[in-house]
Every structure is written in C-alpha cells, then in structure tokens.
C-alpha cells in the first residue's frame, strides 16, 4: 500500500497500476514501473518518508522494431537504423521520479528487490558540480539531502556497480574486450533521474471547476473525447489513445489529440500519465503546464499521421509530442512543468508563422532513444530555463534571434551536436546560452558532414548541397558556463554557411578530458569557406584541469583544434 504526501511543503504521487516489465509493452492502463529502484521523500530530518513513483522507460518501449502500429511485436518491419544500437542487449533503462517541494527534503532511494545499494562513496550524482549530502539508510538504501530551490533540482543518481561502458571501433559500438574498441562513454545501465520541482504558481494551474474546462476521465481516449473547451484538464490517472482517426477501437498508437481551435491550454496534473501527443490549432497564446507526463510510448519510430501512424519519415509531418501547424502569428507557447517520455520523432515544432515565441521552464525529456529526438525549438525571443533533455539529435537548436537558454542539463546519445546552429545559412543575432551541464555523451564515430559529433556544431546541409551566403551572419552569440562531464567529444565542429561575428565561448570545462584515440571524436574542425569571417573568441577553456591557450590548442595538443589556416588572426583563445 502506497503512502503519499499532499501538503504545502511536499507533494508526491503514485500509480496503483504500476507494471514491472522491461521486455514488452505494458497494458494500456498501466505505467511502466522501475524494476530497480524505489523512491521515497521526507521533509528533511523528519524521517517520515512518503512514496514517490519511480517511472521507467526502455528502448523501443517493448514493441520492437516495427513499421506499423498494428505489426506484431519484434517483427522487424521497421527501418534497420532507428538510433537504437546495443541498448536492448545491454539492458539499458531510464527511470525517473518527480515530486513537488518547498523546503529541504531527504530523498531515499531503495533497491526494488531487497538488494543493498552501495555506500555513498560509490554513488555519483550528476551534474557533479552541484554537491549533495549522501548518507546510507538503515534499510539498505541511500538518502540524499535536497535543499529548496525556486528553480528546482534535476540530477542523475549513478551507482558504481551498475555502469555500462560504451566502446567504439570508429564505426559501431563493440564489446569492451574488442582490441579495436575504445571507451567513448561510461553511463548507468539502469539510470535514475530525480526531478525535484517547485510548486507551480497559481496562474499556471487552471481551475478544475471552471465552466470552460473539460475534465478528462482516466482510461481510454477515443475520437474527439477531448471536446472543445478552452482548457483540457487531466487529473491524476492513466490515459491512452484508444481509437484511430476514424473512431475504430481499440487502436493503439494510431491517433493523437488534435485540439479544437478554442482549446488553448493542456494541464497535466501531478500523477497524470497520458499516452499520446498534442496538436494545437488555436490562434491565441497556448499553454502546457503541470507536473504530469506525456508519453509517446505507443507510437512507432517516425510515426506519420498521414500514413496511419506508420513509420514513414517526413520532416514536416512525422508526429511531434507538441505540435501546431496553423499558427496565426503573434503567439506565445507557455510550457511549464511537463515531462516528455519516449518521443517517436522531433519533440516540438510549430508551423504557419515565424511570429511565434516560447516560455519553457521545468521541462523534462526522458527515454529519447530513437534518432530525431531533439530538444524543443527556440523560436525568436524565446526564454528557456531549468530544463533536462535526454536526446538523440540536436539538443539546443539555435535557429532564431534574441533567444536565451539558462540552466540546462543535457544527456546526449550519439546523433548530432549538443548545440546546433546549422542546416542552412542563417541571419541571426543576440543568442545567449549559459549554465549548460552536459552529463553524458557517447558518439560512435567521428562525423563532420550532416551530423557533426561535437558539443557546438553547425551541420552544412540536409541534402549534401553545401551553400554559403555572405550576406548573412551569426552575430552576438554567447555560450557561457559550459561543463561537459565524462570523456568529451570535440568542443566545436562548424561548417560555416555564413559569417560568424562576435561569437564568444567562455568559461568551458571538460574536467575528464577530450577523446584522444583513433575514433577521433575529440578533434574540433572548422573547414575553409571562401570569403567567410570567423570572429570567434574562446575564453577560459580547460581540459582535464589544464587551460587551453594559443600555445597548446593544435590538433595534436591539449585543445585538439583544427581550424583552417585561412581564418588565422580572426579567432582567439585566451
């Protein structure tokens, strides 16, 4: 019997329909529960612990590699290269637990099946730059003291006895015993993330009893059940898309919620778990708030609504977890609190107008094992802060001007850079990215064209047609306070498609060093482009605790920088 907290200082939640199952799809009305961990939370020092549900995500969501949502599990009808490599055979999982708090709390982590967790000296919390007090508990677990924080806390708890070593031969992951293999990352086999969130302000929680609110009932969601009210409210419980677009039932993974034009707000209450995706059609400002979960676990990779949700890739139409295809202009998307699990493609895109901006905070993305699972778009004048992105594509997409991102934690898989500013020539300015913690990366091979394996990157094009536009520039772009943990890939791999002016990278730390082996992912590269300016300043960059300077930056030295000689005198390291 679970025991949860529901007070002004602490709120936790639980699902009685938790299903421990790491091999197949869970029942539609169930939630996959961590088979490894139990999480409890107490007001600090009170020693009165309340249950906090530990969710779990697994690669391919137990469906296997399938093309159509009605295909038999593990029938291998889907594309061979979906971004998932050794994860299933290695038993990789990702668990998370979330709660709301307003004071110091103690988070207790217990093994699920009676084992003992290691003593605190064999526990690492990432980002490591933020220190936590860890002590053993008398019942075989550990207790982590989490201080109050108006921005919340997000961290990974990692145990020395449960790590997986990713090794690559430069083409693919290989066994650690392979003599041609080199370590590219060491990560948890069974990850555990803790999301300690501040309570939402009143203006981010709609009234459940308001006349313009549609309150959903936990269970199956059939065609048009979501109605036409202004607010769509999901109370605690489990929900799933149960019909196809024609209304036939049961049909799993064959529909999403295309909201009525009057509906502008989706609220996911703490404890709401919605298996589906959201498409807005409103011309007003629109919202997604609440500490519930929106999960794409029922969708196949690259699910395309235009082909009955089969996995036919379309950059424009494959399913987004948050989408809008008919913007009216002058709109803002307010997103505060949700967790996104198992996206089947890009997580968020809005179309129809360039006059769109976002305000995103306390946003979490987990279980992003498929390719194309990127971070949210940063539209013009966007402000994003206090986010956690698990991604297997571009994490931070900087395609528009006057955008700010602050306090981001990134767990990167093996596709595309962490920070992306390429694909086509751009004319943008006034970008600020600061306080970025990259806690894991695991690039398989050295790539420069299309999908550069690097922290800061600019892909030259999507179709192999490299274009340079000397009438455009990326100007006044600052990356500040960037930390990459573990053995890191290159700082930058940029194919210039336009000028770079007043581009500043400052206060960068790679405490565990750069990759140095023949896989060659540690080398930064900037090839020549005729007539392009490359005015870039790197300030206070350390690798393994040693400062990179103009005396030790070269490809065979500490910085491993290979910048074409044509740019000499335009860029600097100090």
PLM ranges: what are they?
Residues 233-235, 265-269, 287-289, 334, ...:
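Residues within well-ordered beta-strands of beta-sheet-rich folds
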Residues 158, 235, 289, 322-323, ...:
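Residues in well-ordered beta-strands of folded domains
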Residues 276-279, 285, 294-332, 337-569:
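Glycine- and acidic/polar-rich repeat regions and solenoidal domains
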Residues 153-155, 230, 262-264, 284, ...:
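Core residues of folded domains in eukaryotic genome-function proteins
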Residues 133-137, 244-250, 268-270, 337-338, ...:
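Short, solvent-exposed secondary-structure boundary motifs
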């Amino acid at each position: 019997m679970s025991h949860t907290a529901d007070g002004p200082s602490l709120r936790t939640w639980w699902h009685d329909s938790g299903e421990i199952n790491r091999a197949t799809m869970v029942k539609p009305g169930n939630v996959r529960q961590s088979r490894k961990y139990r999480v409890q939370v107490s007001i600090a020092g009170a020693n009165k612990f309340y249950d906090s549900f530990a969710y779990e995500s697994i690669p391919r969501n137990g469906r296997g590699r399938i093309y159509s949502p009605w295909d038999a599990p593990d029938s291998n009808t889907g594309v061979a290269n979906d971004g998932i490599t050794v994860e299933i055979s290695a038993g990789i999982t990702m668990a998370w637990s979330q709660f709301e708090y307003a004071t110091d709390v103690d988070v207790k982590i217990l093994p699920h099946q009676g084992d003992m967790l290691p003593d605190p000296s064999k526990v690492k919390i990432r980002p490591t730059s933020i220190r936590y007090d860890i002590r053993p508990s008398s019942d075989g677990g550990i207790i982590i003291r989490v201080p109050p924080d108006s921005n919340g806390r997000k961290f990974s708890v990692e145990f020395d006895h449960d790590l997986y070593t990713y090794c690559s031969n430069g083409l693919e992951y290989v066994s650690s015993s392979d003599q041609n293999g080199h370590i590219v990352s060491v990560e948890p086999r069974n990850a555990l993330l803790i999301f300690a969130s501040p309570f939402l302000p009143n203006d981010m929680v709609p009234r459940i009893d308001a006349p313009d609110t549609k309150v959903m009932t936990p269970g199956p969601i059939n065609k048009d059940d979501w109605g036409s009210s202004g607010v769509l409210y999901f109370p605690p419980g489990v929900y799933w898309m149960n019909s196809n677009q024609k209304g036939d039932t049961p049909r799993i993974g064959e529909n999403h919620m295309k909201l009525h034009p009057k509906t502008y707000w989706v609220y996911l209450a703490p404890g709401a778990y919605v298996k589906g995706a959201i498409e807005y059609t409103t011309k007003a400002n629109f919202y997604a708030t609440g500490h519930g979960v929106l999960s794409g676990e029922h969708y196949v990779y690259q699910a395309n609504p235009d082909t009955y949700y089969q996995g036919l890739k379309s950059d424009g139409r494959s399913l987004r977890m948050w989408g809008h295809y008919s913007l009216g202009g002058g709109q803002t998307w307010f997103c505060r609190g949700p967790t996104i699990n198992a996206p089947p493609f890009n997580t968020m895109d809005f179309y129809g107008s360039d006059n769109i901006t976002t305000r995103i905070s306390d946003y979490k993305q987990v279980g992003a094992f498929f390719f194309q699972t990127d971070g949210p778009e940063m539209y013009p004048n966007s402000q994003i802060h206090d986010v956690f992105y698990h991604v297997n594509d571009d994490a931070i997409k900087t395609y528009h001007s006057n955008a700010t991102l602050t306090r981001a934690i990134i767990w990167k898989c093996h596709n595309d850079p962490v920070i992306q500013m390429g694909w086509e020539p751009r004319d943008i300015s006034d970008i600020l990215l600061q306080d970025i913690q990259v806690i894991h990366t695991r690039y398989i091979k050295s790539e420069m064209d299309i999908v550069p394996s690097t922290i800061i990157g600019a892909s030259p094009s999507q179709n192999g047609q490299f274009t340079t536009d000397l009438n455009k520039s990326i100007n006044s772009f600052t990356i500040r306070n960037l930390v990459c943990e573990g053995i890191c890939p290159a700082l930058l791999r940029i194919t210039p498609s336009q000028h770079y002016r007043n581009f500043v990278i400052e206060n960068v730390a790679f405490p565990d060093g750069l990759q140095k082996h023949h896989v060659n992912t540690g080398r930064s590269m900037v090839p020549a482009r005729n007539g392009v300016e490359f005015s870039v300043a790197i300030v206070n960059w350390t690798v393994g605790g040693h400062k990179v300077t103009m005396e030790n930056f070269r490809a065979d030295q500490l910085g491993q920088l290979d910048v074409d000689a044509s740019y000499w005198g335009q860029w600097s390291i100090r």
